[in-house]
Amino acid sequence: MKKTLLASSLIACLSIASVNVYAASESSISIGYAQSHVKENGYTLDNDPKGFNLKYRYELDDNWGVIGSFAYTHQGYDFFYGSNKFGHGDVDYYSVTMGPSFRINEYVSLYGLLGAAHGKVKASVFDESISASKTSMAYGAGVQFNPLPNFVIDASYEYSKLDSIKVGTWMLGAGYRF
């Protein structure tokens, strides 16, 4: 009788302890859509640059983890006078950020991001071409949902200021938790 009681108590304790470590040492990877809104001195681009976002997250323990993010957006422009094309331009935006993540419960995690952003503009009109680029700090925040144990839905916003150009990027993705 004592052995049965001891064994059942031990099994109950181990099962409770295993529920508390549901997130430790787990990883997730997600890929998704990114769209930047570019603004300078009150003016915005006619078409927002679009691209992709890739995130990797590692959970250190039940609550805390780290997350890394890479985002890329691009938009090409053609310049016309009437129906005649006389030039072309490209806007590219890259960012690499990382930061802490905090798991609120089994389904929801919040995170913050800090890192670097790089913007590049190239244009060629007739026989002339110009380009400019700038690297600056980027920061953001996001949320990850785990509606199923191995499925991740990710949503985040990132902001950077490249001299007088302000870039805000929304990202929405899905991925796998393992």
Swiss-Prot record:
Keyword terms of this UniProt record: Cell outer membrane, Membrane, Signal, Transmembrane, Transmembrane beta strand, Virulence
Keyword check for Disulfide bond: no
Location, primary (coarse class): membrane
Protein's UniProt keywords contain Chaperone: no
Membrane-topology annotation of the record: Multi-pass membrane protein
GO BP field: symbiont-mediated suppression of host complement activation
Compartment annotation: Cell outer membrane
Domain of life: Bacteria
Secretion signal span: 1-23
GO cellular component, as recorded: cell outer membrane; host outer membrane
Record's function text: Promotes the invasion of pathogenic bacteria into eukaryotic cells by an unknown mechanism.
Family of the protein in this entry: Belongs to the outer membrane OOP (TC 1.B.6) superfamily. Ail family.
Protein name: Attachment invasion locus protein
Organism: Yersinia enterocolitica
